[in-house]
Each structure stands twice: as C-alpha cells, then as structure tokens.
Amino acid sequence: MSEDKNNPTKPAESGFGADDDRYLRYFDAEMRYLREAGREFARSQPQGARRVGMTMPGARHDSVEQTYEGFAFLTSRLRMKLDDAAPEITDPLLDHLWPHTGRTIPSLTILECVPRTGEARILDTLPPGLQVRSTPVGPDGTICVYRTTRAIHLLPLNVREAGARMREDGRTVIRLAFDLLHREQRLVDDLSRIRLYLHGDRPTASALYAVFTRQVESIGVRMPRLLDGQLQPRPAMTIEAAGFGAQARLWPTDLDVRDVDLDREQTMLEYFAFPEKFHFVDLCGFDAASVPPGETRLEFEIVIRDRIPGDVTFCADNIRLFCTPVINLLELDAQAIRPNAHDRDYPVHAPASAGEHVEPYDVLSVVATDPRTARQYPYQSIKAFRHRGGMIRHESPDRYYHASIRQGVTGQREMVVTLGGHLWAEPGSLPDGHVTVRVLANNGRLPRMALRESMVTTPASTFNGVERVHNLTAPTMPLYPPRGGDYDWRVISHFNGAGTTELNMMDANVLRGALSLYDWTRDDDNRRRIDAIHYVWLDEETERVGARVDRIVNVNVGIEPSGFAGPGDVALFGDVLSRFVGRYACFHFAVRLVLYEGVGGPSRRYPCTIKTGDWL
C-alpha cells in the first residue's frame, strides 16, 4: 500500500476549513488507508468482500462507508491524542539532557562600544552580562533589553587604517594601523591580545576570517619613534580565531561541565543561527613594553601566503574594536504561584507590567515564603541532583523544582515548573502557599519583523569608560525549535550511543540530516550550504606517536563551493564542521575531517579530534 498513515498530509482545500483543522488531517489519512486496505482485501479475499458489500458495482454501500468513517473517527482521535501526548514526555527529556535542542534562541546582534576620548582613561574590562536597551519596537513601543555575552577589554587604540597591498616582491600584505592614546598611562597597558571584529557582509567578513586564521605567514610592526619606522619582525605574534569554545557561548548554560560536553553541537547551532559570532579574531603576542615613550602610532604588517579569497577589498570600517554579541535576555520575577494540594505542575507567566510579548526562557531560582514569619525557603533545581533520595536522603533539601518547556493549549510554548520534594511526598500535603519564581525572559513574542527594525543604543548598566554603544548588525529574529513531525525522536537518535550509530551509517544523507537538526532558520542560504554536501565516505589510517599507534577515522566530505558565499564562507563552514564531527571520536579511535571542494578542487585535512574526559 502506498499510503503512509504515520505521516498524515493536509486534506484537500474543501469543506469547512480543512486547512485549519488538525483533526481532519488524521481523519482523511485514516480514510485513505482504509479504502486502499479495502481494495487489497477485496483482491485477496473476494468472497469475504462480497459478503460484506465491498465489491458491489457503483458507489460503495452506505454501511461500508459508515463503518469506515466510524473506525477512522476513533483511530484518528487516538492517534492525535498520542501525538499530542508525546511532547509531554520528549520535551522535558530534551530540555533536561540536551537543553540547547529545545530552547528558544532569542534575538541576537553585535554591539560596538565607543570609548571616551579627551580624558584620562580608566583601564577597565567590561564584564559579560551588562544590559543595553533598544529603541521602541512595534506598535506598543516595547523596549527590548539585551545583555552582553562576553567581556570587553578596553585598550588605548583606535583603528586608523586597514587594507591590503602588493609588495615589490609580489607578496600580499595586510596593513593594520592604530592610533595609540593616553601615552601617560602606557606602562599599565596590556596589548598582548587585541580582539578584532570583522565587520561587513558575509563574503567580506568570512574572507577576512579565512585570511587571518589560515594564510598568515609572518607579522611585523612599525612604530615611527623606533628605528625610524622600519619594519620589525615579530615571530612570536599570531592571529587566533576567537569565536569558538564554551567561553564564547551566546546563551547562558546550566552547568559548565555539560556545556563543554555539548560544545560541538551548540557550535553548529550557533553557526546557522548567528554566523557573525565567529567573525572575531585575536591579534596575539604583542609586547606593550616595546613601545617607546611618547609613541602615538602602531602599525602591523601581516604577510599572507596567497591572495585574499574572492579578491575582496576592505578598509578600516571592516575592522572594529570593542565589540561583543548581545542577546535579548532580561531577569524578572514571574507571577507568584499559589500552590494547591492537587497539582504539582504550574505555568510560569511573566508579570503584566513586563508586557504581553515577554516569554520566560529559563528559571533562575524558586523560593517559598511563609506569609506569617516572612521566612524564605529556597527550592533546589532537580538538575543539580541534590534532591532527597538514596544515601543522602537525610541531608538533601526538602524542596526541589523542575522547569520545562511545553506546548500550551493555544500551541504556544509555555514554561512549567514542577514542585516536589520530601515535604510534597505525602498526599494532600501543602507545605508552601506562596512561591516566587525568578526567571530569564526575552521578547520572543514581539512581531518578528519588528525586532529587525530596532536599534540598540541605550546603556542600562554602567559601562565604565564608554561614551556610547550601538549595534553593528540588524537584530535577528528569535528562533524556535521545530515543532511537530519527528524532531524529538531524531534528536534522541542523534545523541544515541554518543553518535556511534550515526557514524556507522555515515553518508551524505545522514550528515545532511544531522546538520538539518541545527538549522532552525528556514533560510534558503543555509539550506544551500547543507545541500552542498554531495558525498561522504569513511576511511581509516594509523599514526605512530612515540611508542603508541593511534587509530584515526577520516570523515571525507565533498562539497560544492557554489552553495556558499565565497571561499571564505567555505573556510568557516569547514572549521565548524571539523569541530562538529569530533563528536564521533571515542577512546578506540580519533576522528578527522577531510574536506574536498568541488571536482578537482582543493582539499584540506583538519587536525584530528581525540576523545578526552569520561568513558561515556
């Protein structure tokens, strides 16, 4: 039978709102299945089919049609109930084990901080978590709050010039010139790591990323007051990518250990959601003590091996200092919970004063308050595994909570807090009558295009030494995990056995399917990048390291470069993919990505990834 009743399709555009009724999709799928099954039964058992009226000429007998409809009604209701109940099991499981697969990705943008000039500078580092506000958004004039995700090191530098030129010997040189400020405080400056943001459209920014991370051959420095401005080689200086690793995570995480374990998967999710996050590089190794007194200019000459990918051009506007990603998250107290003796699950709602567009993102704390004594009793998160039980049943807290994201009655995502613990174990017990929940929230329910039009220009926290702030990129729209279908089961299968099942079946379709789990944007450009993977195969090699022999599995991936925004975009995709396939490494073998660009094009062997940490 050709009909697949496990994947109900939309009914035809007829009748009473067929496109809007979910139940009709199940009902029509069951009816199609029953009719086709009836035809097969009539062919295989003609006498039995004749007795029940299934082979009568002309229209099908009313009794047969009514039987079909009654059976389809019951089974479609049952199937819809099962499909509706499955997320109640799978969604909390995903949120607990792999939280990045089930949480909203709030709006993101790149923020630039402009330091104060004309006064004595206070050497400072701006910590992550500082808040900035947007201009009024939407018809109600909602102001969105963003927070910085990384620390910003303020340095006495201004970008004066940037560009590429050809030397007399035919080598391409990138020149970065900075103004040195506040020379009276030069001795306390630390210029050993200068962070640069590569600003521009995707082909330009990714081409600069590829140049700085792959093609640097040597770095020299010129200072007008030193040796009459002659070039001084600095072999110890390097340029490193600054957008990778758990320390560069865009969103807050529950546990640092789990964040490190899931770094490869979260990096792929960040790549599709906000690629600008990877357009940061660090100029490392410059010694500020070598700057002579009174120097006002610092110029770096970077010799690269080949031409800039795509022959893109750039200027000082493409090299920015003091930038960081910011995310639309704010802390607030949710509406108080009034527990009763019958329920354990309570929805978490933002206060009315925050606006109707605010939705909870994560729970920070849950506290019960005794109204008679004003004494507070904190709840422990079940994710910390400190709830009462086992050998520590006499020492653990009496209260714990579990927060999860579920699909509400209206189809929107809602946060639910489950209260439990030893004090709640007895039937009918009500240990607390007033519970407050502190949450992280975002403006995810704003009209989606309204966020794209906002500007982030107003500091809401103290930015020491900063004159003004503004966003360099348009804020992204919030992204939600895919709903419906088999997304939850695909995620569970993806992480099953630490990816060994996926590796054993690895081919182009499997890899494309794995990457599609991390693309929530529905963007045609991202879809083309995934579809550009044409073939995948595995081979094995051994490598002798000292007295041991390492076994290495090579994941060979062939891509079509036309699916990307230039050679630089291919380079960034390769770096992210190399990190991602490292998830398949285990204690029996290491994993290496080998990337082939087109037919007869260049190939690149990436460093192999070796399993570290626990056995599981």
Regions found by a protein language model. Give the residues of each.
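Short, surface-exposed linear segments at secondary-structure transitions and domain or protein termini
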Residues: 154-159, 247-251, 460-471
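Short, low-complexity Pro/Thr/Gly
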Residues: 183-396
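C-terminal domain/tail detector
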Residues: 2-7, 44-47, 371-616
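Extracellular ectodomain segments of secreted/surface proteins
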Residues: 63, 75-82, 100, 161-171, ...
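Short, Φ-rich (hydrophobic/aromatic) sequence segments
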Residues: 63, 67-74, 93, 212, ...
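Mixed-charge (acidic/basic) macromolecular-recognition segments
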Residues: 2-48, 249-291, 299, 480-518
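Extended assembly-interface regions of large multimeric machines
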Residues: 2-227, 231-236, 240-243
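Residues at beta-strand starts and edge strands
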Residues: 105-109, 170-174, 190-192, 215, ...
